């Protein structure tokens, strides 16, 4: 699901809300999450999951075209861990699809 699809689905589900308000709400939430992660804060949404940063140390990589060694600097990457309720819900729905 893309951001546009999420906005459209929410607008359909809540017809009393103006589509522009739904779009603004989704964009505001995602922007606030991005700002929090960029400042090093952890985000926890109970029942859904948590977002935090994982540290990747510097390493020597390879250029796939030339095969030469390339220095890859250290960095932090966003990481999502699904909460228990979400894991159970996904597991249950995948079991129903298999049947």
Curated annotation (Swiss-Prot):
InterPro entries: Hist_DNA-bd, IHF-like_DNA-bd_dom_sf, IHF_beta
UniProt keyword annotation of Cytoplasm present: no
Top-rank taxon: Bacteria
Keywords recorded for this protein, A-Z: DNA recombination, DNA-binding, Transcription, Transcription regulation, Translation regulation
One Gene Ontology MF term: DNA binding
The keyword Transcription belongs to this UniProt entry's keyword annotation: yes
SMART domains for this protein: BHL (SM00411)
GO cellular component labels: chromosome; cytosol
BP terms from Gene Ontology: DNA recombination; regulation of DNA-templated transcription; regulation of translation
Pfam annotation, one family: Bac_DNA_binding
Family: Belongs to the bacterial histone-like protein family.
Stated role: This protein is one of the two subunits of integration host factor, a specific DNA-binding protein that functions in genetic recombination as well as in transcriptional and translational control.
Subunit structure: Heterodimer of an alpha and a beta chain.
PANTHER family the record matches: DNA-BINDING PROTEIN HU, INTEGRATION HOST FACTOR SUBUNIT BETA
Alphabetized HAMAP family for the sequence: IHF_beta (MF_00381)
Entry protein name: Integration host factor subunit beta
Organism the protein comes from: Laribacter hongkongensis (strain HLHK9)
């Amino acid at each position: 699901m893309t951001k546009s699809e999420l906005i459209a689905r929410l607008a359909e589900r809540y017809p009393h809300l103006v589509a522009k308000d739904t779009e603004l709400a989704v964009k505001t939430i995602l922007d606030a999450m991005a700002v929090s992660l960029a400042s090093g804060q952890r985000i926890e949404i109970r029942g859904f999951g948590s977002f935090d940063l994982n540290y990747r140390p510097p390493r020597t990589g390879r250029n796939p075209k030339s095969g030469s060694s390339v220095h890859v600097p250290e960095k932090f990457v966003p990481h999502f861990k699904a909460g228990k309720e979400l894991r159970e819900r996904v597991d249950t729905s995948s079991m129903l699809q298999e049947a």
